[in-house]
Amino acid sequence: IKGRKTPEGDRRAAVLRADIDALPVTERNDCEWRSQNEGVMHACGHDMHAAVLFGVLKTFAEAPDFRGTLFGLFQPGEECNPGGASLVLAEKPFEGYDVRAVVGEHVEPQLEVGTLGFRAGKYMAASDELRFRVRGTGGHGAMRKQLKDPVAAGAELLTRLIALNGEECVLSIGRVEAGGATNIVPDEIYMEGTLRTFDERERGIIHRRIEIIAADIDARHGVKTEVTIGRGYPCVVNDEILVKQATALAKAEKLKVEMLPLRTTAEDFGFYCKQYPSLFYRLGVGAASGKPHTSTFSPDEKAITTGIAFMQALALKLLNEK
């Protein structure tokens, strides 16, 4: 949704982004706004993100006191690769504009209702999806000399992958499938998980180490491992000047502000950070809201008022200053 109130030659612009996709969770909340679709709910606050952005745009539509062009971006596909942000940018909707900032927010139960959270520089991790299919020769569990055991190879692979964890890397395997039985070794096993990093160089190094580990295990166990690394979202890196401006504005508006720690979770907002000055901040909804990605998550609606007021004020500051 694009609004413009400026002479044709003024190309200044600001982009306000809200993600809008839901999650495959059956909602257990008993409220007026609960999901009407079984097995799907807004378990991560994206409905509140959309409500805040809608409120900002509605306010500007009634009193368009900004200069330049304001983009209201309701973005799908944040929760899964390749990320809706990458698909939006592939269409080049902001080409020819002087984009002063791409701004996004996310609800945060660990902050009090209405509190705003900021972090300059690196904020959220890059994320990749890992898949491994280890193929060997199965058979009777008593005849091990006749086997090329994919379970043993897979167990060693899992152990060595987890050993990669450190300050610059968070690697988890969340799914293992093998089949077989007490006396049957299967022909193959399957594993999948995620890799999260904060440095592009380190990201590439770990990708190569994963391939080397798999090849070494193949050689010693006589198996063949198919490694698939699905490159996902880049790091969310907040523009330091924008963080200073936003923090000062929030304090001037008498809002409570907290500085945020580095997070190992990921967000496709990182794609915007690679192309434009960007700011991704947190909107407190209180601990009583519950935990995101659960069937009872319900952000406190009182945060919406703060969310609208701050995002509107920030957009005005970005567009109206020379």
PLM ranges: what are they?
Residues 1-42, 51-54, 58-67:
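Acidic/His- and Gly-rich active-site-bordering loop/insert found
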Residues 14, 73, 101-103, 251, ...:
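Hydrophobic/aromatic beta-strand patches that form the interior of the parallel beta-sheet core
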Residues 15-17, 130-132, 280-286:
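Non-cysteine beta-strand/loop elements that form the S-adenosyl-L-methionine
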Residues 17, 52, 104, 126, ...:
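Structural signature of FAD isoalloxazine-binding scaffolds in flavoprotein oxidoreductases
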Residues 23-25, 30-41, 47-48, 65-175, ...:
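Histidine/acidic-residue-rich, glycine-tolerant segments that coordinate divalent metal ions
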Residues 52, 84-85, 146, 206, ...:
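Residues at alpha-helix caps and immediate loop-helix transition turns in enzyme cores, especially N-
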Residues 151-322:
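Metal-dependent amide/peptide-bond hydrolase catalytic core
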